[in-house]
């Protein structure tokens, strides 16, 4: 079992436990950040009102939420389930659950309305990785992993097929502090891309989860200081771009909000990053292009607390 240690430590397999190295700042820049943290500057993000109709005017019929909870038990103690009950999604996808199925908290198993529950966790690594998918409707079919042994040992992917689409929730491997796992991440990216392309050839695809990459400079607060750090290396960004092109998929948030800055989903626990909005957009809803006419809205719930990530929500009119 990997030692928990401090945030920013490296697990035994090299997976990084959430860090966000910052570029060195001048005193002037530091003062600017203080003003922005106080709401006096442009750095804070306000989630606009939900758009619940498609471009053609059809009302939304499906609401999916995704959240990296950074440990189910801690998330529940921090009232994460209260937010879920208020948000009331039709499907809830969770990443970094750090919990085997036989140790799931009772509060989660008894969650009203989301009675079809599917979980995946590493067989030999207690308290590490893990994903969950909870649904109001019973899926036609559910599978786990991407069908390649090298990549299916850490409980990172669940696939659920519904009538009109396939939903994949994923917790993509982190390249690690010092990029100790970058080569593995590149192999994962290639295998994951092949897998998703196969799925998307049969049915429209929705991919959601913590994809552990900020795609463009607009997707993190300090791009210049992080080009050699996990989550923003050229290799990871290129891999993400190739995923969008090859499958193909569209980034639902950027499709609707192409130029909106300061929209992040992850903030390190260190250095008051969240209050200053020094963050990264690592969590996504990616859609087959055939689903774009059904896209009503793609939301970042940045005010929801309970993890070092915030939840994201997708509205579709299917």
UniProtKB/Swiss-Prot annotation:
Which residue windows does the record flag with biased composition (Basic and acidic residues)? 16-38
Catalytic activities = Exonucleolytic cleavage in the 3'- to 5'-direction to yield nucleoside 5'-phosphates
Q: Which Pfam family is one of this chain's hits?
A: Exo_endo_phos
Q: Where is this region: Necessary for interaction with YBX1, binding to RNA, association together with NPM1 to rRNA, endoribonuclease activity on abasic RNA and localization in the nucleoli?
A: 1-33
Activity regulation remarks:
NPM1 stimulates endodeoxyribonuclease activity on double-stranded DNA with AP sites, but inhibits endoribonuclease activity on single-stranded RNA containing AP sites.
The first-level EC class reads: hydrolase
What SUPFAM superfamilies does the record point to?
DNase I-like (SSF56219)
Q: Which residues carry this modification: Phosphoserine?
A: 54
Its cellular-component GO annotations read: cytoplasm; endoplasmic reticulum; mitochondrion; nuclear speck; nucleolus; nucleoplasm; nucleus
Q: Where is this region: Necessary for interaction with NPM1 and for efficient rRNA binding?
A: 23-33
What EC number(s) is this enzyme filed under?
3.1.11.2, 3.1.21.-
The record's active-site residues are 171, 210 (proton donor/acceptor)
Q: Which InterPro entries does this one have?
A: AP_endonuc_1 (IPR004808), AP_endonuclease_F1_BS (IPR020847), AP_endonuclease_F1_CS (IPR020848), Endo/exonu/phosph_ase_sf (IPR036691), Endo/exonuclease/phosphatase (IPR005135)
Q: Could you tell me which residues carry S-nitrosocysteine?
A: 65, 93, 310
Locate the residues binding Mg(2+) 2: 210, 212
- Name the PANTHER family for this protein: AP ENDONUCLEASE, DNA-(APURINIC OR APYRIMIDINIC SITE) ENDONUCLEASE
Summary of subunit composition and partner proteins: Monomer. Homodimer; disulfide-linked. Component of the SET complex, composed of at least APEX1, SET, ANP32A, HMGB2, NME1 and TREX1. Associates with the dimer XRCC5/XRCC6 in a DNA-dependent manner. Interacts with SIRT1; the interaction is increased in the context of genotoxic stress. Interacts with HDAC1, HDAC2 and HDAC3; the interactions are not dependent on the APEX1 acetylation status. Interacts with XRCC1; the interaction is induced by SIRT1 and increased with the APEX1 acetylated form.
Q: What else is known?
A: The specific activity of the cleaved mitochondrial endodeoxyribonuclease appears to be about 3-fold higher than of the full-length form. Extract of mitochondria, but not of nuclei or cytosol, cleaves recombinant APEX1 to generate a mitochondrial APEX1-sized product.
Q: What is this protein called?
A: DNA repair nuclease/redox regulator APEX1
Origin species, per record, is Gorilla gorilla gorilla (Western lowland gorilla)
